[in-house]
């Protein structure tokens, strides 16, 4: 196939009539785009039907779904349905992985010990981490000794460990768009990850879900059939 500047689903056999299952064509298009560093662009107001699947479609390049519509049909996926040992209701349609995997940064124990010796972190005064990273970094802070609770409503529970994610620049300065939400009496753990340098843009598209109608117990009825993002520096435009 002659190398093109963009890829569309019809190049790989998609019908786009809202009836034919276009899952395999969509997967093939993205795999080709990923391999060749090409954007995926939908042409016109096509409707793509997506049925059950056992693995997500990977996205590594820019996508413009434009006026296209995607029908994600869960109506035939029972809560406990499996294929090849995989629970079908838990398979995302699209997945945006981090190129080369997630790069974790080590060596922050000294800073953590210093912070704890000084009484922790105050959300009103914390502006900088005294570490020279050399590049922007995503930090995840934990206080395993403190729990935050949702006490009322359908999401009420037994609490979760206090944690949040912030971004600092190459010199350790806190990004004003990611201020601390909580005070930390103690930082028990800190994970640091390199931020993906190359930006990625996902835009356009209308998504419709046909749900599976069931009277099964509530804990069986959570479906994860959408788009999962596991990298940073991604812009979503509706």
List each model region and its residues.
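Extracellular/periplasmic carbohydrate-active domains that bind, remodel
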Residues: 1-238
